[in-house]
């Protein structure tokens, strides 16, 4: 970065402190504009609220939190499966001036206690399924108020609250702790201020669902504790209602009745669920015979063949984005017009899109020097959607935000048109015979075989090469009968030949193992760390 001019009148300029806009003000604006339009539908729990009713409920909860002792910047831990009152909780915590801390509800009691120790909650909102956790938290000395999902404070739309709510905040007051997946250690709390979260939501509106309004409907398919929560909050600008998927986990059988029944126009999901949406699309219907305008997917790579099938059945409604918790996913976007003409590099890897609005992507080498188009390095990001840092993790902050950029840990390159291609993660890389190997390239090649459902390649210690690659495969269909071992051997031989034909020799996995089900983390990500530990046992140390 260049030095500041010493002759400029702005050389010593310091911005004046100013009051921020509480993100919950967006809700009030929409409630004033379209008070009687639907905002939330949760038919499993018998809840349907208008925007005015949601605003009143947020006000009532904020008043209860402040009465219970929650001050500005105090943490409110929110632990619950999806429910209309989780949506009320998000808006109510924001309005109170507290900080939303929503860990994955699938975490164990011990894991939740670890997160609680990290963020020191002043209050807890939980569903009854987490009563044991609340008891355990109290045993550690927690004495703050507890609010139960299903029994949160209510208020009639337009009613004057009995307790006045002070929702004023500084623009740099934290308002959301967005937990990382913790796949390489305990989750970190990426901290978003009201200024950051406002920018994130406006970015989502601008890039992901720019034309949505109160006549549409957004289907909630994933836990609101992570990216789906951001997607839900972003619907406020258009006044689009959030419909919580009824009947439990989304399946091929339940998705289309929900999409058709509610007239869904947008949804945020992962490739696995998008594949179910495409697979379950009723036969005899064409791409124009549904209401979907934007199906937004992220969280994992999607095979080109799966993309092609979804495009063929659903038409040009797919939107892909890439990002991490520290940027709430807001790094790249692959728009509908890019799908079907998706740029592919020489290794057959597809792009994850161009930079999101207001975001700059920078590729750097090991020394932090910016690299030109076409050269591979670490993917770094700058922009208003990048979090303020990790709560209480100075070492992680120094590493991840070195040089003023957020270092994603992903490896890739930009082409001349600004498309980003990811080739791996720094943490996944292993060194075999002195050469760096990034598993992603190998995994994407293995996934082109129709008998492979999932593939993970990990580096394990080897006395000759330092490390070797081990491929762990979950088959699309497990073989049965007496010849199942032979079928596995045949597939392993075919996959080895596939790798030899498409990769440099040092990248070809030395071993291939099959598992019935691939292990995943509580956040649904493939458990690489667990697989690496399992297949490294008894092999000694690589270095």
Model-derived regions, located:
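AMP-dependent adenylate-forming
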Residues: 3-4, 26-50
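Conserved AMP-binding/adenylate-forming
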Residues: 19, 43-47, 63-110, 221, ...
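Conserved adenylate-forming
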Residues: 65-70, 162-172, 177-219, 231, ...
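Structural core segment of the AMP-binding/adenylate-forming
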Residues: 67-68, 95-156
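AMP-binding/adenylate-forming catalytic core of the ANL superfamily
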Residues: 107, 124-126, 267, 383, ...
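Conserved AMP-binding/adenylation subdomain of ANL enzymes
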Residues: 198-217, 225-265, 280
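Conserved ATP/PPi-binding loop(s) of AMP-dependent carboxylate-activating enzymes
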Residues: 354-358, 366-399, 437
């Amino acid at each position: 970065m260049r030095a500041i001019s010493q002759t400029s009148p702005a050389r010593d300029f310091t911005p004046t402190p100013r009051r921020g806009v509480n993100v919950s003000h967006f809700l009030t604006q929409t409630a004033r504009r379209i008070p009687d339009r639907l905002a939330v539908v949760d038919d499993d729990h018998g809840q349907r609220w208008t925007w005015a009713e949601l605003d009143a409920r947020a006000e009532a909860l904020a008043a209860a939190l402040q009465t219970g002792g929650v001050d500005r910047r105090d943490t409110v831990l929110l632990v619950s499966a999806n429910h209309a009152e989780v949506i009320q909780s998000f808006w109510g915590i924001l309005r109170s001036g507290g900080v939303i801390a929503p860990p994955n509800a699938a975490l164990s009691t011990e894991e939740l206690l670890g997160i609680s120790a990290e963020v020191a909650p002043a209050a807890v909102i939980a569903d009854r399924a987490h009563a044991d956790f609340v008891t355990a938290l109290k045993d550690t000395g927690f004495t703050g108020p507890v609010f139960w999902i299903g029994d949160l404070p209510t208020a009639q739309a337009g009613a004057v609250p009995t307790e006045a709510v002070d929702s004023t905040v500084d623009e740099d007051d934290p308002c959301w702790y967005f937990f990382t997946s913790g796949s390489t250690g305990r989750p970190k709390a990426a901290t978003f201020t009201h200024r950051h979260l406002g920018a994130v939501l406006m970015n989502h509106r601008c890039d992901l669902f720019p034309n949505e309004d109160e006549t549409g409907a957004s289907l909630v398919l994933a836990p609101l504790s992570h990216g789906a929560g951001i997607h839900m909050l972003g619907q406020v600008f258009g006044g689009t209602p959030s419909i919580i998927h009824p009947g439990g986990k989304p399946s091929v059988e339940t998705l289309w009745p929900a999409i058709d029944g509610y007239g869904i126009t947008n949804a945020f999901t992962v490739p696995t669920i998008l594949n179910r949406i495409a697979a379950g699309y009723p036969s005899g219907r064409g791409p124009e015979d549904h209401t979907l305008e934007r199906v937004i997917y992220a969280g994992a790579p999607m095979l080109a063949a799966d993309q092609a099938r979804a495009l063929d059945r659903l038409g040009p409604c797919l939107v892909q984005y890439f990002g991490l918790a520290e940027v709430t996913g807001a790094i790249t976007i692959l728009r509908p017009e890019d799908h079907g003409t998706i740029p592919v590099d020489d290794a057959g890897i597809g792009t994850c899109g161009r930079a999101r609005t207001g975001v700059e992507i920078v590729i750097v080498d090991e020394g932090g020097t910016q690299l030109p188009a076409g050269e591979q390095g670490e993917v770094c990001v700058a922009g208003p959607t990048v979090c303020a840092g990790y709560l209480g993790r100075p070492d992680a902050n120094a590493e991840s935000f070195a040089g003023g950029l957020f270092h994603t840990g992903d490896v890739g390159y930009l082409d001349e048109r600004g498309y980003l291609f990811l080739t791996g993660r720094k943490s996944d890389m292993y060194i075999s015979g002195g050469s760096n190997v990034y598993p992603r390239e190998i995994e994407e090649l293995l996934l082109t075989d129709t008998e492979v459902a999932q593939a993970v390649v990990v580096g394990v210690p080897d006395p000759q090469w330092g490390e070797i690659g081990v491929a762990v495969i979950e088959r699309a269909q497990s073989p049965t009968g007496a010849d199942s071992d032979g079928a596995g051997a045949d597939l392993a031989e075919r996959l080895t030949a596939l790798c030899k034909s498409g990769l440099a020799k040092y990248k070809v996995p030395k071993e291939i193992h099959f598992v019935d089900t691939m292990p995943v983390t509580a956040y649904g990500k493939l458990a690489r760390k667990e697989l690496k530990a399992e297949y490294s046992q008894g092999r000694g140390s690589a270095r």
